Amino acid sequence: MTTEVRADLYPSRGAAEMTTPRQDPVIWSAPGAPGPVAAKDLQGYEHDGFLTVDQLIAPDEVAVYQAELNRLISDPAVRADERSIVEKQSQNVRSVFEVHRISEVFAGLVRDERVVGRARQILGSDVYVHQSRINVKPGFGATGFYWHSDFETWHAEDGLPNMRTVSVSIALTENFDTNGGLMIMPGSHKTFLGCAGETPKDNYKKSLQMQDAGTPSDEALTKMADRHGIRLFTGRAGSATWFDCNAMHGSGDNITPYARSNVFIVFNSVENAAQEPFAAPIRRPEFIGARDFTPVK
């Protein structure tokens, strides 16, 4: 009997930090394939690892989603659910995961062609939701999230084999340049940074609030920032930022009076379904990394 050895294109969580050139396309669809993203915007996405839409959803739609977000984070049953992340210091609900299963309102947003159509075009196939959540960053001291590549975690802990995954962050409040907005290093998606250190069991319980395993070193981040620069994203409610799964990104604290909230949806190609983790002892729970690969229709 022989045991098949699984290829790992992106090694991480070993004894030392290491870089690997990207082995996968950024845009998976054929040139000229139909879809809502213009050719020049696809070129920008391929080059920078992100694209922005100034007004993906209209103000009246924003109001509906904002009301649903407020309903969910105010619901004691949702707050007590393991899918909700409550900040220890403030006791504020910061995130609610698997929101497309909890709420039919957000399930409808996932199915909206303005949303899922862009994912299909970028990934060149049908897609399923690997992860969804609503995020709330209150004013007056809400903590940010340190620099990381989502793919590093999704590969190491969820078993996504290839970089065929795209995220969208849809703003439900205005994103100023002062209230802890999303930052991305343009072009960083072309290099995979494998992080040092083993993955603890049940690492997700800590990492959803403060990333530790899978965190790049200061030296590596400095080199990447010097090479690529840093882009801070601002925009009105209803704007959206699409970004590649391997883009190095993070966000700062929000010490302003102005809260931020968004909907975050991760689409993965049905041809890139999750396997066993590449660098973790156990799978993360399904509400963080889906095992239902049913295409969004």
UniProtKB/Swiss-Prot annotation:
The entry's L-ectoine-binding residues are: Q131
Alphabetical list of Pfam families matching this protein? PhyH (PF05721)
Cofactor binding note from Swiss-Prot or TrEMBL = Binds 1 Fe(2+) ion.
Gene3D superfamilies reported in the protein's UniProt record: q2cbj1_9rhob like domain
Q: For site (Important for ectoine stabilization), what residue positions does UniProt give?
A: W154
Q: Which cofactor does it need?
A: Fe(2+)
Q: What is its EC number?
A: 1.14.11.55
Q: Where does Fe cation bind?
A: H148, D150, H249
Residue sites binding 2-oxoglutarate per the record = K137
Keywords per UniProt: Dioxygenase, Iron, Metal-binding, Oxidoreductase
The record's listing under InterPro entries reads: EctD, Phytyl_CoA_dOase-like
Q: Which GO terms describe its molecular function?
A: 2-oxoglutarate-dependent dioxygenase activity; iron ion binding
Q: Name one GO biological process term.
A: ectoine catabolic process
SUPFAM superfamilies, per the entry: Clavaminate synthase-like
Record carries keyword rRNA-binding: no
- Keyword check for Cytoplasm, yes or no: no
The reaction(s) annotated as catalysed by this protein in its Swiss-Prot or TrEMBL entry are: L-ectoine + 2-oxoglutarate + O2 = 5-hydroxyectoine + succinate + CO2
Q: Which family does it belong to?
A: Belongs to the PhyH family. EctD subfamily.
NCBIfam families (UniProt xref): ectoine_ThpD
* Assembly: Homodimer.
Question: Tell me, what does this protein do in biology?
Answer: Involved in the biosynthesis of 5-hydroxyectoine, called compatible solute, which helps organisms to survive extreme osmotic stress by acting as a highly soluble organic osmolyte. Catalyzes the 2-oxoglutarate-dependent selective hydroxylation of L-ectoine to yield (4S,5S)-5-hydroxyectoine.
What name has this protein been given in UniProt? Ectoine dioxygenase
Name of the encoding gene:
ectD
